[in-house]
Amino acid sequence: GDQFATLTACALATRRILLGTSISSVFVRSAPTIAMAAATVDHFSNGRFILGLGPSHKVQVEPEHGLVFSQPIQRVRECVEVVRRLLRDGDVSYKGSIINIERFDFWFTPLRKEIPIYLSAVFPKMLQVCGEIAQGALITWCTQEHARSAAEYVAQGARQAGRNPQEV
């Protein structure tokens, strides 16, 4: 089923648990669609939603969805920027190197103007991006050693962006 629909049902059936997507692919959904879905779950959960985004993998995006998997890191960066602008401002015009939106308007006011965004990452560059622009990193299937090195890459990205690594 659809992760946002399932999370909305969970939101209506619970009161305290935090709800998150783990990873919603920035290739499979457009940035405005992600922002609308996130705002909807956040509304029905009364602010308990955490948005997890990532590029997914070429072996899923291309054969399973019929889309071209290219420039995943840039696509993630632009998607995060568009999602944040929509949540904050309610509308967006955006010209990026990948995402181009003439104008998109929510036509509603989100419950929160800022929803925490976590990014999925496996390799060093994407882990650094997590530190630069996200509230945290989503890593799976890793050893303790990989988790430690991943944390260092996230911290490097945070420092490069002028952020406190302890806040990521």
What kind of region is each of these model predictions?
Residues 1-168:
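Active-site-adjacent structural elements that line small-molecule/cofactor binding pockets in enzymes
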